Amino acid sequence: MGIGEDQMQGSSGREEKIFVSVRLRPLNVRERARNDVADWECINDETVIYRSHLSISERSMYPTAYTFDRVFGPECSTREVYDQGAKEVALSVVSGVHASVFAYGQTSSGKTYTMIGITDYALADIYDYIEKHNEREFILKFSAMEIYNESVRDLLSTDISPLRVLDDPEKGTVVEKLTEETLRDWNHFKELLSICIAQRQIGETALNEVSSRSHQILRLTVESTAREYLAKDKFSTLTATVNFIDLAGSERASQSLSAGTRLKEGGHINRSLLTLGTVIRKLSKGKNGHIPFRDSKLTRILQTSLGGNARTSIICTLSPARVHVEQSRNTLLFASCAKEVTTNAQVNVVMSDKALVRHLQRELAKLESELSSPRQALVVSDTTALLKEKDLQIEKLNKEVFQLAQELERAYSRIEDLQQIIGEAPQQEILSTDSEQTNTNVVLGRQYPKLRVRSSWESLNITPESPLSAQASIMISPQSTEHGSDENVFQLSDLRLNSGASSPAQHLAFVTPGKFTKVRLNIRGVESKNQLHIHKGESVDQSRVQGERLHEMDEPSEVDSEDTCTELQCIETESPGIIMYPEPNILPDRCKAVSALPLCEPESKNSRPPTETAEEKEEKEETEEKEEEEEERVKEVSSVSIQTKEKSGPIKVSPRCVLSLTDESFPDESSNLKRDPTHQDFVTPSPEKLYAWHLESNGQTAGGTGFTRSRSCGASFVSSSSFSLSERDANTPPCWYQNERAESNLKPSNSKRPPLPKHISRMSMPATWFEKDFNHTQRMPAGLDGVNMIKSSPNGSQVSTSKSHVYARQTSGRALISQDEGEETVPQRDKRIIHLSMEEIEQKFLALRSSKSFKDAAVDPIQDYLTMPLNWPLEFKRLEMEIIELWHACNVSLSHRSYFFLLFRGDQKDCLYMEVELRRLKYIRETFTHNNKAIENGRTLTSMSSLRALNRERYKLSQLMQKKLTKEERENVFLRWGIGLNTKHRRLQLAHRLWSESKDMDHVRESASVVGKLMGFVDMDLASKEMFGLNFSLRPRAKKSSLWKRSVLSLSIL
């Protein structure tokens, strides 16, 4: 039997009616003994008639002749019944079509006798077909069940527990945990069939000595696959099922004389057969109304066979005896209804990849032919609905446009209000032909409402040779001192960064009211080399500023002040250079003389930069030549060869930055600074800022302090409040530490917290420096070694608590840090303690990097900074176990644990993050041990609050399981974690088992995998470790996160 490709596809199927046949058995021994008369007779192969003994009036109530697809008389054998009534349907299974064969009738009418023979003949023919078609490989699977008292039981199993009937979206109705045996040969089938006969429920009644008391369903699944890919019609896997259903017979209790158990069994049998008859009757009238398939287990299991994707044959058995006339007539009525039921059988194909490709190619060719042929005009029956839909869409879009316009208007009014508050009237935009300038102004104006773009840059075009003019041009006006502590003024003038052309200097002024530190950036494009000159001006006299009170200007700026960052992105060219000039000190009288000059004076819209004279052009050329000479001298001193490619490119941004600095000293002013360690106007920035001081050895006074950047470099300017706070946090110990430090200098014998010995070199730290106990926070941080600490006394005078020391002992350069100390609160102290370890790490990095070349620092800064143990994998495992135990003790968020565990997998560069996490956890544990409160990211943490947060997170994870995982995935996870599928609150059980064992690494790894899947973590190999937040949690982060920004910036510099 060949199976064509089109037939196997069966996409639409074919409709056909159920094949109904009637088998009339002869009178049995009991009926002949009672001298019963046969009232039914087969007059031909399709008609059965009733030889009525009733009167003419009674005959008119019932039909006397019934016509079906095939009628078998008493002389017909079971072989004939199979060949002409069931063979074609049963053998459809080898063609990939589902099939079902029913035996329906009253009790003792011969149903079981008929179905046993049909089952044997069908299996024999299937095996004969398999032997004749060696080109395909066949797999036969056999299962059997019975429905006894509306309970489904497995006939191939000794377990009599009932089975559940489930609905599968692909397979339809299935029986859970039903045994399915793969047949080896014919003998194996006969053995299984004998087991089914022995397991089936039977009983004796007055009508039948061996009466079936249950409905039996024998199911055979046939799968066939082509052995070789030889022809287009032999490429797919066919899967189909044939059911042999032997129904229990309907009976009357008055005739069967049943009682007790037999009466109960008969009631269930009649009820299920009544539901079957109702389903058949409604299907015969069409499938429009409700079909009660779920009213009985029998109809629910056979739903596909009765009116779905299957070919069905029903054999109705009759008893000719007059005593059973009414039961026989009901059977014929059932058969008449079943004859009108239509099924839609389809070929069930599991297509292989090659077959799927061919099918798609054929579909593609069909679609291409349709496209190539001229399209027929589409007739739109009703255009009113389409027009209404379009009108609604237009109205919706108009509303959105109106709302966006209102939001834009409010945004512009907000900008104008802010400009009026800071004392600068709104300026109208000046139309410019330069598209880059226009785009920059628009973007900066929307993202930074306090950012004012100057239309002229000539007033700030100051070269390093004119420090007085530079200082005068950026002095703070009295009006600017009225800004709040969170207010920052950032000026950007004419941001036209043309890397290939030589253009006048472009300046940016950044003002922080806390210390009124000015940083001016001169962005120059000199031929093919872009150099960024940073001039750090002098501070305004502190005595003049202390008299003026800084107040808050508006509430929104106070909330967002710590989060506001103005980032200066690096200009990626082939060979960028950045030169930093610490300008000489200016005497207080000079400061007073120029302090009246305003910082940012509004310019009229008609102002234009003056035309350059010949003298100015010559001065610029001389300045550029001097700068090139200084750059060459710096390259020779540092022994760094910077290869340049004469190429001009666009501005690009990259998140990482490596800075290396050399020294440029000014003989007079720098010496004054070194002699005066308490000078207020010279502040060395902390490592979190965009530069780091690196002083060359031998005390030489070289030209230009320069540092080189990598091609991907990003630096950040923080706002005023966060700038001053970060500077204080980076270099200032807690107030209790200062007091005891001062006491230790005065009374060494009474000191309880001895500071770190100053004669110990930073390079002599042990390789396992991360093993140092973080609990001893009373020791002096490494970041404070060699720092002048100035403490304010009650009368306003300043007392120096230590002498100046060399900052990095590997070099002979000097960097002095001077800052004001003020009173701090307990939350500020807690925040600082966490970051002292970070400061120590960063200071070590700066100290160690000074002994490396620029090339080494740029290529692998982390390896230069870290002194790795000899066996890092073992050390990583030890640190990992310690961190996991601390996570468990401190009730750390499960999402943070999982993200950290999956992200850091033992790379040598991960030791920095392991150390930071370890110290943070030790601090939290120490705080919880003393029943104190820890402050992290602006939140107060206690042992109980962290435990409550952990329980809330577990509850949220249990909710995510319902959304993120399918039912099958959830069941697999429950089984893998030892949670029974029949238990309650399975998701909560799993959530509370996650991360519950801190010493079992398999448990930890599996917990991290589950949480990662629920939280939707991306591939950890692609994640940016530099930007990883050590406080990662389910809850949204608070707005004020300047403390975290400092940590992220520090890690990005590394």
Curated annotation (Swiss-Prot):
Keywords: ATP-binding, Coiled coil, Microtubule, Motor protein, Nucleotide-binding
Domain of life where this protein originates: Eukaryota
PROSITE patterns for the chain: KINESIN_MOTOR_1 (PS00411), KINESIN_MOTOR_2 (PS50067)
Coiled-coil boundaries: 350-425, 611-640
CDD domains membership: KISc_CENP_E
GO biological process, one term: microtubule-based movement
Region (Disordered): 600-648, 740-760
Family: Belongs to the TRAFAC class myosin-kinesin ATPase superfamily. Kinesin family. KIN-7 subfamily.
Name this polypeptide is given: Kinesin-like protein KIN-7G
Species name: Arabidopsis thaliana (Mouse-ear cress)
